[in-house]
Amino acid sequence: MPTIQQLIRTEREKARQKTKSPALKQCPQRRGVCTRVYTTTPKKPNSALRKVARVRLTSGFEVTAYIPGIGHNLQEHSVVMIRGGRVKDLPGVRYHIIRGTLDTAGVKDRKQGRSKYGTKRPKEAKK
């Protein structure tokens, strides 16, 4: 416990909050280039083949980002936009690729939650 005199001399240091997405450098999104697109398996007790990509960002970081939705058109050298947001059952995956921007196509035949997957509104069927 410091004395009052010690506190006058040097005030207490504020506890700094550590960011959960350092590669974004305080920006909401970042652009990057895919260096590798592959599938990986989640932690126990889940089982699947999750689609992920290794992305080199304009901020200089190389991160692993999750590709949401069913099916994708990404390959090496695709230019993508990433946002923060981890995938709970994939250790080390702290970013999501934004569908429907740059080289990433939206999810085909998506009817609900379209804005999250970059899908345009479907044309109404003519009667």
Curated annotation (Swiss-Prot):
Post-translational modification 3-methylthioaspartic acid, affected residues: D89
Residue ranges, annotated region (Disordered): 8-28, 102-127
Keyword Protein transport attached: no
Domain of life: Bacteria
UniProt xrefs under SUPFAM superfamilies: Nucleic acid-binding proteins (SSF50249)
Keywords: Methylation, Ribonucleoprotein, Ribosomal protein, RNA-binding, rRNA-binding, tRNA-binding
Any one biological process term the GO annotation gives: translation
MF term (GO), any: tRNA binding
InterPro entries listed in its UniProt record: NA-bd_OB-fold, Ribosomal_uS12, Ribosomal_uS12_bac
Feature: compositional bias, Basic residues: 113-127
CDD domains named among the record's database cross-references: Ribosomal_S12 (cd03368)
GO CC terms, sorted: small ribosomal subunit
UniProt keyword tRNA processing, yes or no: no
Gene3D superfamilies: Nucleic acid-binding proteins
Matching Pfam families: Ribosom_S12_S23 (PF00164)
Subunit structure: Part of the 30S ribosomal subunit. Contacts proteins S8 and S17. May interact with IF1 in the 30S initiation complex.
PANTHER family given in the database record: 30S RIBOSOMAL PROTEIN S12 FAMILY MEMBER
Role noted for this protein: With S4 and S5 plays an important role in translational accuracy.
Protein family (similarity comment): Belongs to the universal ribosomal protein uS12 family.
Protein name as it appears in the record: Small ribosomal subunit protein uS12
Designated gene of the protein: rpsL
